Amino acid sequence: MFRKWIQAGCLFAAFASSAFAAQETYVVGAGGTYRPFEFENSQKQLEGFDIDIIKAIAKAENFNIKLINTPWEGIFATLGSGDRDIIISGITITDKRKQMVDFSAPYFPAEQSIVVPATSKVTSLASLKDEKVGVVNSSTGDIVVSDVLGKNSTAIKRFDNTPLMLQELFEDGVSAAVGDVGVVKYYIKQHPEKQFKLVPDAKFERQYFGIAVAKGNTELLAKLNSGLKKIIADGTYAKIYNTWFDENVPALPAQ
């Protein structure tokens, strides 16, 4: 009988130890100024597409997270210093950044898109040559449109942010606009009355956002990749995407 109690106690301790290990908490850094990916709500809490994604991954992998609003300037250094375990902040995966951090599998396709009124005849980037086009100043969209129309073209109208640019499109100040696909999709979802549509173009370079961890942290990286695969497979990713953007859920390399 005594041996049975010892065995039972050992089993309980093993289960308790396993449960404790599974509930590890990771500190997550995210910027609070890139709507709809991450931004502060009225309660000063972080929310957005990225925030929902990392929460879903944490749930799928049975770990906890502590979210901290982290300014973009110096965000990568927080991994090296150990102040953050994970950063997710609309970070484009590039070869240069891969030298500093390790990235998860891509979780969002980052590319440009043309935005026009629903009745527009614009069908491609090339067809913007005869149009007045809005871009966000010094953005990727600005670079792309400048290549088509010429950097000093008077047909390019530059704005400080996407909402200003798309309001001008609504008021017929420009015939088309080019911007980050996630940002413009979110705007269109928030303002269906403006009746905009997106026009893709194969010439827009497709890049991807990734979740970053400190160089060499293979254990945490494996958890992130495993969790991402799980939420894609069970439909959680699609639900989150639908909430912030639309029903055209992209295929991802993780699939």
Tell where the protein language model's regions lie, with residue ranges.
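Ligand-binding cleft/hinge of the Venus flytrap
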Residues: 40, 54-63, 141-159, 188-193, ...
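Periplasmic-binding protein-like
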Residues: 108-116, 188-225, 229, 247-255
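Short helix-initiation/N-cap motifs at beta->coil->alpha
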Residues: 51, 66-77, 157-171, 205
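Hydrophobic residues within well-ordered alpha-helices
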Residues: 57, 79-80, 128, 168-170, ...
